[in-house]
Curated annotation (Swiss-Prot):
Pathway: Amino-acid biosynthesis; L-histidine biosynthesis; L-histidine from 5-phospho-alpha-D-ribose 1-diphosphate: step 7/9. Belongs to the class-II pyridoxal-phosphate-dependent aminotransferase family. Histidinol-phosphate aminotransferase subfamily. CDD domains: AAT_like. The keyword Amino-acid biosynthesis applies. It catalyses: L-histidinol phosphate + 2-oxoglutarate = 3-(imidazol-4-yl)-2-oxopropyl phosphate + L-glutamate. The gene is hisC. This is Histidinol-phosphate aminotransferase. GO terms for molecular function: histidinol-phosphate transaminase activity; pyridoxal phosphate binding.
Length: 360
């Protein structure tokens, strides 16, 4: 009798990732504020570029992503040869774990960190190690204390998701200074465009050989449905990651749309301007209702309620009004709701709904 087919150790320990909901029973067209998407969608230039690319769908895309990497390099001042493009920054995170962590190795991430970090670590056979945060902020001292001889990777999202908090460059540098030789620091910059005065780790990456940053086109660029992201790091790391990257991991449409999106600086700047104004209005309105909110450095707000029951009641009330937000219980925040900053009229609906709940 042959042995049963079994997956690799650790695979069945992976909890399925739960994305933001998009449907509510009884509401044909709900307001979705659960996935931190750009409410204005992609740049019109990106939409046109994708439409133009459809006619070439019978052709394989370029394998080196040279045009997209050149556009990223030009707009963001990065070295094109130090960029790797992936199917969202998620794929780059998986590449890093596959290449640099395995059985017997540890991958550190923070208490309320992005759920993909432990998934990618377990998929590579490594052990994810959660490190406590300090009032929903990355705690550098706790991370340094958590480093062991088995530590290979440290992931921090800055700004963080789902908390929207961030630490400054001085704290990030202090963490990088404390890394042992065998350890890589990965700065997840999915929301970095929304954080004023922060380079996402660019200067730190370029000054060291053990720091990598990741970025995505899913947030400010409004291309979550295309799945495009990239990593920026030392040449030796990027060359290693490219060895396991599929040659055609990005479609021709994705490459065309992402290149046009990154080049449409005016569209991006206008989206950022509206987000900053509306974020401040949303935070102010929530605080006036007695809800605690940390200052947000992203395109969403984490509202804290008096209890888990109060958060559940607010979530249910918003759903009855046709509004979907994210209840981040799986992130250890049962008394919170994460609310994407929407269009002005969207945010007005949220505040009106919660005002009615408080007044009831």
């Amino acid at each position: 009798m042959t042995a049963p087919i079994r997956p690799q150790p650790g695979i069945l320990d992976i909890a399925l990732y739960q994305g933001g909901a998009s449907k509510i029973a009884g509401h044909a067209d709900p307001l979705k504020l659960s996935s931190n998407e750009n409410p204005f969608g992609p740049s019109p230039a990106a939409v046109q570029a994708m439409a133009d690319a459809v006619a070439s769908s019978h052709r394989y895309p370029n394998t080196d992503h040279a045009d997209l990497r050149a556009a990223i390099s030009e707009i963001h001042g990065l070295e094109a040869d130090n960029i790797i493009c992936g199917v969202g920054s998620d794929e780059v995170i998986h590449f890093l774990c596959q290449c640099y962590a395995g059985p017997g190795d540890e991958v550190l991430y923070t208490q309320h960190g992005f759920g993909m970090y432990p998934i990618a670590a377990k998929a590579a056979g490594a052990t994810p190690v959660q490190v406590a945060e300090d009032a929903r902020h990355v705690d550098v001292d706790a991370l340094i204390a958590g480093i062991t001889p088995a530590t290979r990777l440290i992931f921090i999202a800055n700004p963080s998701n789902p908390c929207a908090t961030m630490i400054d460059n001085g704290e990030i540098t202090r963490l990088a200074d404390a890394l042992p030789d065998q350890c890589l620091l990965i700065l997840d910059g999915a929301y970095v465009e929304f954080a004023d005065g922060y380079d996402g780790g660019k200067n730190l990456v370029e000054a060291r050989d053990n720091v990598v940053m990741t970025r995505t086109f899913s947030k400010v660029y409004g291309l979550g449905g295309l799945r495009v992201g990239y990593g920026y790091g030392p040449r030796h790391v990027i060359d290693t990651l490219n060895r396991i990257r599929g040659p055609f991991n990005l479609s021709g449409m994705a490459l065309a749309g992402a290149e046009a999106a990154v080049r449409d600086v005016d569209w991006v700047n206008e989206c950022l301007r509206v987000n900053a104004d509306e974020r401040a209005r949303l935070v102010g309105g929530l605080r006036q209702l007695g809800l605690a909110c940390d200052d947000s450095h992203a395109n969403f707000v984490l509202a804290r309620f008096a209890s888990e029951a109060a958060a559940d009641a607010a979530d249910a009330h918003l759903k009855r009004d046709g509004i979907i937000v994210r209840a981040p219980k799986s992130y250890g925040l049962p008394d919170c709701l994460r609310i994407t900053v929407g269009r002005p009229e969207d945010n007005s609906r949220v505040l009106a709904s919660l005002t009615a709940l408080v007044a009831a």
